[in-house]
């Protein structure tokens, strides 16, 4: 339907949608001009002008179309019957953003209208080519000059040509666009046909219905403040939304009615929600209801999601801001309620703080420590418990209160014999370390024998001499007594030799508490000295934590794996931090970064353990008394297994001592063929496996009576278990432990063929690095070549140099040895069997030299001979280490004729004096050599004339 209506250009970013009421501001001149358009002529004889007649005709047609009723007979002055066209404007900013005036349906130069209420000479503003047919509900006087009109949207319109643009209120031709389905005043027959729903339209309708329903639900919630305010400000529109939403269901009936309802719902929701101007323009431009539903459902869903997120963020921020205040108020209310009910907690915050204060005041602290504690107590009393610093300060004070400032363990000073008995019961051998510990215990006992009166007199005299001018003790002037300082021992040895258990035995012998601190993998200096309290999660260092856990200030502290402590890095140097702890002249005033005042560590007995000394810094090593613990020999392992391991594993596996019998030869076979280690850990595992196997055999031999297992005591009384043999034999080990892990073919050959000899084959002696020794065979051969020496068997640099020295000595003494070989025409190959095992060291020099001499002279070497020693280019035999292990290894291999350097005779004498060899050395024929010529004489009973060294 076409009509002519007054044209009202809306303010910027303003859109009037059908079915929605809105206030629009007008100037006084514009309001008067609009009313004059519908004013009756004063003279009854004067007819309406042509423009007025067209305007009145259009208004009458629209009134009939929209079924508007007059409320009085006051002619066209009744404001409720005045109908106008409201068109949104395109601002200059929007024109610049789009880059062209015709963007978004803007008119050409003919459709540009002036801003209402201004002179026509001012800058024009473009308007959209579509708008809304509105009726003026009422006029309102907003001030002395301006007016406001309340307009109600009736339908969409399409803007045509301007009819009159001379006045303040222009008129224009419009086309009313109710919908695209033909429901207008001029609808044809096709409008009677019922439209159908497509799948896409149904899906969009469901989204629209769900979004609208969720908006209403959110508005009903108490915490949805944003939606509540919107709904409250648009009460009329909100009521219309509820009415249309009730009509609109998930299963629509009449498609025509449902479309009308959905179209009206989109317009109403776009008016309620704070949507953008562009979104409202897009909905207003959608003349087709399906198109309007599609755009509206998309816009509403997006805006609804954004508003839900905004509501959630606002709620979260508000809750976090008020959390502390709410907690404080709740605590106060809870305390008041408990007081009224008489249910107050006797152990409240104040009571705990009072108890902590009393505990701190009762400690015997130094003046510096007492000053720090007093200051922190004053601080914490002024803080509210909700303050973050409160818990930090309280943790610090609790840490100080839990430290053993004046708590110590009274040493159970036993006699030297009693202490030795305790150490011997826990460990076999280790006589040198036991000797050092007994020395300390003896000194401690002698000091304790002084009378209490003498000690009191000395303390009184020392206190009087160190008093300051005010009669108070001056700690800075008090001399430090180092006479009673405990030793700082470093036990160095391979794994499993009993370093950790030895420290426990020392604590048991003294009656002191034991504390173990693992230093392996410590890479941060703060783990030793502690963190400063300014850091989040700060805590004391390992030593302060250890004292806190053990509860006394004089424990035996084991510094385990001190050789594996980290070196200098960007976290500091932990090894350097240990210098103060392990210095007897400094650890009395050890300052932890967390405590931040001196703590006395001088009363602790520090025992450190390490596997080697190479990784320990020299300054740190200098502060400790090093005691070497060598690996156990096979004979020592035999005694340890008999005395400690077998009874322990027998009991652990539910057997009695007499129910498992492992002879010495079986234990020795386990040590040599199944375990080769410095300690006894793996040996204990193998013995445990043997005991478990015997436990299975013993359980099988038990008789069953009526399905119940007969007890061992009952069976013993009956004389049962005749089929059970408690004795373990070597033949049983294969079934229990499997095949032998280590085989000594060379030793077996020496035992089975004692008279067989081979040219160029010699038995050396090697220390295996696990506390054990054994044979190290060398094989030499020659072939035509160019005088090259080839070495195989995974030999290290040192042993390769020893081989070169040996060959050079043979070449230089070839004439004296009666060797006529042309060394430039032969290649020499020296091989050490067991090529997968690395071999290194200078102690095989004598053996390799003898192999070369045997090769070139063609003389075989008896397999019953073994030797060790380093050799120089002049043929001098130098001393080597590991003599005890090498001799015992040779004995187990069946070799009893040994050649040692003369300088190692003292080592053999010392072992015989200590008796740690179990009488093995007395059964061996040991020869001592000083030069290589002595070796040749002992092997082949030949005398050689060495070369005369020229002195010219």
Curated annotation (Swiss-Prot):
Location within or outside the cell: Peroxisome matrix
Any single Gene Ontology cellular-component annotation: peroxisomal matrix
Keyword ATP-binding: yes
Record-linked CDD domains: RecA-like_Lon (cd19500)
Location of region: Disordered: 179-198, 457-477
One GO term (biological process): protein quality control for misfolded or incompletely synthesized proteins
Domain Lon N-terminal: 5-304
Short sequence motif Microbody targeting signal: positions: 950-952
Molecular-function annotations in GO: ATP binding; ATP hydrolysis activity; ATP-dependent peptidase activity; serine-type endopeptidase activity
InterPro entries: AAA+_ATPase, ATPase_AAA_core, Lon_bac/euk-typ, Lon_lid, Lon_proteolytic, Lon_Prtase, Lon_prtase_N, Lon_prtase_N_sf
Reactions it catalyzes: Hydrolysis of proteins in presence of ATP
Residue span, Lon proteolytic domain: 756-942
Entries under Gene3D superfamilies matching the protein: 1.10.8.60, 1.20.5.5270, 1.20.58.1480, 3.30.230.10, LON domain-like, P-loop containing nucleotide triphosphate hydrolases
Sequence positions that bind ATP: 493-500
Alphabetical keyword list: ATP-binding, Hydrolase, Nucleotide-binding, Peroxisome, Protease, Serine protease
Active-site residues (renumbered): 843, 886
EC number: 3.4.21.53
Family that this chain belongs to: Belongs to the peptidase S16 family.
Stored HAMAP family: lonp2_euk (MF_03121)
UniProt function note: ATP-dependent serine protease that mediates the selective degradation of misfolded and unassembled polypeptides in the peroxisomal matrix. Necessary for type 2 peroxisome targeting signal (PTS2)-containing protein processing and facilitates peroxisome matrix protein import.
Protein name, entry field: Lon protease homolog 2, peroxisomal
Annotated source species: Yarrowia lipolytica (strain CLIB 122 / E 150)
Lineage of the species this protein comes from: Eukaryota, Fungi, Dikarya, Ascomycota, Saccharomycotina
């Amino acid at each position: 339907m076409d009509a002519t209506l007054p044209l009202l250009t809306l303010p910027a970013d303003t859109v009037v949608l059908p079915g929605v009421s809105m206030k629009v501001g007008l100037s006084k001149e514009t309001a008067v001009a609009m009313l004059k358009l519908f004013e009756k002529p004063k003279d009854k004889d004067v007819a309406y002008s042509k423009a007025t007649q067209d305007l009145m005709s259009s208004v009458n047609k629209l009134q009939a179309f929209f079924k508007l009723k007059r409320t009085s007979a006051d002619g066209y002055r009744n404001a409720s019957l005045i109908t106008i066209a409201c068109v949104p404007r395109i601002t200059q900013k929007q024109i610049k953003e789009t880059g062209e005036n015709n963007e978004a349906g803007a008119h050409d130069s003919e459709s540009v209208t002036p801003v209402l209420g201004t002179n026509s000479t001012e800058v024009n503003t473009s308007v959209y080519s579509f708008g809304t047919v509105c009726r003026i509900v009422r006029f309102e006087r907003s001030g002395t000059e301006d007016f406001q009109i309340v307009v109600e949207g009736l339908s969409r319109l399409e803007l045509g040509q301007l009819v009159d643009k001379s006045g303040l209120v222009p008129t224009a031709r419009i086309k009313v666009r109710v919908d695209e389905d033909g429901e207008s005043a001029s609808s044809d027959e096709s409008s009677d046909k019922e439209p159908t729903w497509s799948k896409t339209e149904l899906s969009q309708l469901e989204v629209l219905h769900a979004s609208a329903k969720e908006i209403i639900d959110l508005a009903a919630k108490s915490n949805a403040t944003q939606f509540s305010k919107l709904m409250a400000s648009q009460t009329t529109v909100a009521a219309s939304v509820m009415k249309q939403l009730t009509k609109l269901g998930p299963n629509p009936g009449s498609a025509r009615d449902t479309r009308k309802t959905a179209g009206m719902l989109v317009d109403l929701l776009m008016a309620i929600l704070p949507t953008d101007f562009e979104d409202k323009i897009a909905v207003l431009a959608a003349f087709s209801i399906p198109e309007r539903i599609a755009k509206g459902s998309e816009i509403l869903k997006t805006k609804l999601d954004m508003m839900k997120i905004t509501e959630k963020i606002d709620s979260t921020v508000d809750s976090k801001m008020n959390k502390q205040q709410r907690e404080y108020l709740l605590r106060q209310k809870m305390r008041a309620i408990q007081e009224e009910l008489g249910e107050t907690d006797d152990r409240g915050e104040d009571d705990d703080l009072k108890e902590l204060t009393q505990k701190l005041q009762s400690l015997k602290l130094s003046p510096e420590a007492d000053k720090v504690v007093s200051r922190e107590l004053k601080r914490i009393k002024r803080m509210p418990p909700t303050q973050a610093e409160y818990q930090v300060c309280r943790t610090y004070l609790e840490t100080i209160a839990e430290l053993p400032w004046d708590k110590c363990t009274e040493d159970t000073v036993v006699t030297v014999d009693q202490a030795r008995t305790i150490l011997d019961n826990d460990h076999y051998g280790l006589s040198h370390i036991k000797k050092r510990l007994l020395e300390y215990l003896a000194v401690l006992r002698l000091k304790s024998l002084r009378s209490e009166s003498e000690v009191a007199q000395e303390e009184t005299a020392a206190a009087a001499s160190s008093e300051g001018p005010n009669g108070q003790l001056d700690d800075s002037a008090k001399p430090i007594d180092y006479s009673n300082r405990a030793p700082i021992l470093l036990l160095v040895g391979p794994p499993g030799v009993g370093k950790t258990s030895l420290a426990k035995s020392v604590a048991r012998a003294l009656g002191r508490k034991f504390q173990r601190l693992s230093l392996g993998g410590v890479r941060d200096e703060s783990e030793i000295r502690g963190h400063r309290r300014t850091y989040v999660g700060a805590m004391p260092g390992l030593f302060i934590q250890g004292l806190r856990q053990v509860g006394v200030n004089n424990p035996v502290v084991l510094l385990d794996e001190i050789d594996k402590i980290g070196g200098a890095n960007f976290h500091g140097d932990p090894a350097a931090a240990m210098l103060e702890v392990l210095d007897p002249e400094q650890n009395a005033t050890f300052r932890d970064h967390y405590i931040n005042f001196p703590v006395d560590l001088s009363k602790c007995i520090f025992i450190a353990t390490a596997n080697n000394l190479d990784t320990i810094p020299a300054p740190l090593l200098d502060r400790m008394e090093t005691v070497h613990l060598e690996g156990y020999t096979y004979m020592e392992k035999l005694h340890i297994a008999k005395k400690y391991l077998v009874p322990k594993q027998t009991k652990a596996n539910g057997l009695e001592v007499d129910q498992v019998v492992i002879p010495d030869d079986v234990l020795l076979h386990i040590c040599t063929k199944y375990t080769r280690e410095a300690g006894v850990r793996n040996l204990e595992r193998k013995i445990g496996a043997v005991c478990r196997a015997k436990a299975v055999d013993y359980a099988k031999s038990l008789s069953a009576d009526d399905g119940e297992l007969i007890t061992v005591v009952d069976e013993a009384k009956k004389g049962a278990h005749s089929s059970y043999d408690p004795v373990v034999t070597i033949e049983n080990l294969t079934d229990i432990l499997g095949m032998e892990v280590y085989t000594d073919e060379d030793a077996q050959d020496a035992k089975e063929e004692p008279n067989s000899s081979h040219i160029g084959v010699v038995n050396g002696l090697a220390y295996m690095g696990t506390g054990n020794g054994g044979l190290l065979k060398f094989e030499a051969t020659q072939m035509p070549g160019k005088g090259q020496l080839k070495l195989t068997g995974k030999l290290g640099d040192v042993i390769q140099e020893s081989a070169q020295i040996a060959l050079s000595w043979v070449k230089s003494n070839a004439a004296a040895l009666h060797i006529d070989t042309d060394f430039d025409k032969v290649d020499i190959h020296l091989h050490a069997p067991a090529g997968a095992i690395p071999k290194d060291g200078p102690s095989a020099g004598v053996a390799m030299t003898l192999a070369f001499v045997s090769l070139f002279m063609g003389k075989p070497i008896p397999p019953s001979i073994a030797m060790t020693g380093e050799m120089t280019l002049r043929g001098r035999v130098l001393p080597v280490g590991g003599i005890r292990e090498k001799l015992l290894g040779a004995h187990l291999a069946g070799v009893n004729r040994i050649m040692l350097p003369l300088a190692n005779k003292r080592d053999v004498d010392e072992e015989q004096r200590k008796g740690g060899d179990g009488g093995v050395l007395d059964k061996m024929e040991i020869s001592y050599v000083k030069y290589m010529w002595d070796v040749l004489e002992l092997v082949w009973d030949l005398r050689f004339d060495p070369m005369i060294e020229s002195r010219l």
